[in-house]
Structure formats: C-alpha cells, structure tokens
Amino acid sequence: MKSLLLTVTLSSLVATLQTYDDLPFISEEDKLSGVWFIKATVSQRREVEGETLVAFPIKFTCPEEGTLELRHTLASKGECINVGIRLQRTEEPGQYSAFWGHTLFYIYDLPVKDHYIIYCESHPFQKISQFGYLIGKYPEENQDTLEVFKEFIQHKGFLQEKIGVPEQRDRCIPIHDSAHQDHKC
C-alpha cells in the first residue's frame, strides 16, 4: 500500500512538473526566512571520490523587500568557511543576482511543502558555472522531492551522477581542532 501511495504521489509530482520551464518561482522572499537544510546538490565540478559530502544548515533572512541574505558554512580542506551572500531580486521573476551581477540565482517553489530548488549560474571571467541545491525546512530526506530534483537537473543538462546527497551536520568543526581530531568537516 505504501509503495502504491508513493507511486501515485510521485507520478502526480512528475506530471505537475512535466515542463520545468513552468515550475513556479518563489512568490514571496519571506517564505525563505529561517534555517534550511541542503537535501541534495549538483554541480559540473567532479567531486573528490571517497570523500563524504557534508552540509550545514543555511540561514536566510529578508532584510527588505526584494533582498535575501544567505549565511552558510562550507567545509574545505579541513577548514570551516563562513559565507554571507546578499541576493537582490532582478526584474525577471524568481531571479536574484549577486556578486555584481556575475551570479544569478533562480528559486523554484516545489509542490511539496517547505521545499525549494535553488539553481545558480555564475559567469565570472567569461566562464559559465552552474550548480543547484534542493533545500528543505527539515533535515530528513524526502524521496519525492529528490526525484523532482533529479528530473529538474536533467532538464538543465546535468548528469545524475553529479548529484550528491550530503550528510547533515549541525555545525562545522575544523579538523585541526585538537579536541576533535577524529571529526572531519
């Protein structure tokens, strides 16, 4: 019975999103205010084989209409890097720009409550880099939204092998921290 329900739910989600150009953009920035969890990522870069993909919560704030601020921690080579990005809404629906217009963010509202896709195109130095995130309000996996994300990124030209489902962690602890030598970021 559960598999039948899952199949029906998934089929309706996929049918709803048949044309991904019609996937609705977020309508109100304040819907994103709060803490979010990265459920899946995709990027053109090849990730290091055998290395665990780790994600930390993202915090969005909406200081004024048309502006989103994103605070996030990244782990790189055992170091914790705190990142703050200010996104400014453009004239295009669902589009936000950052880094002097070199990076465009598109925020898609999914039919599953409290889930969004953030798709980014970065154009620094005439190179184009694309990446995407499936985010949710809660850290637990949601198979339905993951399937929608897979279909979405395939439509954008990514290979499914590039999808990463990260291990959720509350906070980043640098590996050089002697109290936590066994804990890698």
Swiss-Prot record:
Cellular component, GO annotation: extracellular region
Entry protein name: Vomeronasal secretory protein 2
Signal sequence bounds: 1-19
CDD domains the UniProt entry points to: lipocalin_1_3_4_13-like (cd19414)
Cross-referenced InterPro entries: Calycin, Lipocalin, Lipocln_cytosolic_FA-bd_dom, von_Ebner_gland
A GO molecular function held by the record: pheromone binding
Source organism phylogeny: Eukaryota, Metazoa, Chordata, Craniata, Vertebrata
Location of the protein in the cell: Secreted
Annotated keywords: Disulfide bond, Pheromone-binding, Secreted, Signal, Transport
Principal subcellular localization: secreted
Origin: domain of life: Eukaryota
Family of the protein in this entry: Belongs to the calycin superfamily. Lipocalin family.
Disulphide-bridged cysteine pairs: C80-C172
Entry-linked Pfam families: Lipocalin
Role played: Transport of lipophilic molecules, possible pheromone-carrier.
Tissue: Specifically expressed in vomeronasal and posterior glands of the nasal septum, the ducts of which open into the lumen of the vomeronasal organ.
Gene3D superfamilies recorded: 2.40.128.20
Gene: Lcn4
Record keyword Coiled coil present: no
